Design a protein with these regions (language model features):
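Hydrophobic h-region of N-terminal signal peptides that target proteins for export
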Residues: 11-19
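Primary mode marks residue(s) on the alpha4-beta5-alpha5 output face of response regulator receiver
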Residues: 20-45, 52-164
Length: 164
């Protein structure tokens, strides 16, 4: 085999491995397989509350998002956090790991352990949810009136995984 042929072959072999960035360890779900991956468009809702030192600060309240697959609405995401599929299946999660978003304005990537299931359908076997590829969602600015609410647009991808 000539060098002219060997170099492109090596580049082809190395290409996909180099292009695929692994998830941060804090949100990886080793040994689990993907059940469903969806895109979400929505808002992170914040409330102005007194913080630990008595000063007013924005506190995360809840997400409100539409879950999309191939441009079609297939579910929703809301406080709990809950993810509800159009087939009636739903899961509730609890954050167990996080990693920073790409930009300062991006909410963090999360790993959530499923703590409850409802209904039967595509989400029935889900054990873990990952929130990745976040864009936006963090609130910046002054908070000066307790009880005030603000919504910050965000998008993310949610990956639903099962054991094995």
């Amino acid at each position: 085999m000539s060098i002219k042929l060997a170099v492109p072959c090596l580049l082809l072999l190395a290409g996909p491995a180099a292009a695929a960035d692994p998830l941060p360890d804090a949100i990886a779900a080793l040994g689990e397989s993907v059940v469903l991956s969806v895109h979400a468009e929505g808002a992170q809702v914040y409330e102005c509350k007194a913080g630990t030192e008595g000063k007013l600060a924005w506190a995360f309240r809840e997400p409100i998002a539409t879950l999309l697959s191939d441009g079609k609405t297939i579910g929703r995401h809301y406080a709990g956090p809950n993810w509800e599929h159009a087939d009636g299946s739903a899961v509730v999660g609890k954050a167990v790991g996080n990693a920073p978003g790409a930009l300062a304005a991006d909410i963090p990537w999360l790993k959530l352990e499923v703590t409850a299931h409802r209904g039967n359908g595509v989400l029935t076997s889900v054990a873990t949810v990952q929130r990745i590829n976040t864009n936006g969602g963090k609130l910046d600015g002054v908070c000066d009136k307790a009880g005030e609410f603000r919504s910050v647009p965000y998008s993310a991808d949610y990956v639903f995984l099962k054991k094995g």
